[in-house]
Amino acid sequence: MVAYDEFPIPTADTFSLTGGDAQVYEAAVSIFNRKDCPEYFSEGSSDLILPMLVQYGKYQTDEGNTTYVVNFARCFFFDLGNGLGDMQNPVYTSTCLNNLASITLGKDGALVAFTEAKDGTDDGEFSRFAHEICGPMTDLAEEITAAGGILPEGEHQVPNVNSYEAMVQQYLDYFFEG
């Protein structure tokens, strides 16, 4: 069994990310990982949780920083640590929590700010959050508000995998097969 605290925290290298994708993924991991968000993990579990982003757009701030507007997904792979008898066919159940967010990186690529829409808000309040998160991209804010918070597709996904299964397999191959 691999316990939740024995799964390595992913890096951009885990998914062969480079450039802006690497920077925004490293920021996502710094926001959401088992050390900084222990409330998502339970003692004795064998769960893995990975962040994933669907980028809807990006813009430059007045300060010259880059803000990424994303669907910030927290992907849960339940009981994975007990299902690793065959690394190429791991056994687990999964789900993802999705939320509209913005991640702002400085000119050096370091995390400057993270803003996430609040859960349980009414339509008017969500619209305000969407406009705050989207900044000057008002058409995107309107589209997100009309869709109820999450768009089915974005510009691209980070890491760029075609499924949650592919993401967890790439993670396992990187940390456990090498």
Name what the model sees in each region.
Residues M1-R74:
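N-terminal export/targeting and maturation segments
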Residues E6, T14, A113, Y174-F175:
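Intrinsic disorder/low-structure terminal segments
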Residues P8-P10, P38, P51, P90, ...:
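Proline-rich intrinsically disordered, low-complexity coils
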Residues L17-Y25, S94, N98, D123, ...:
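Solvent-exposed, acidic/flexible segments
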Residues Q23, Q55, Q60, Q88, ...:
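Residue-identity detector for glutamine
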Residues L48-G124:
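Mature extracytoplasmic domains of secretory-pathway proteins
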Residues T121-G178:
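C-terminal partner/receptor-binding element of secreted or periplasmic proteins
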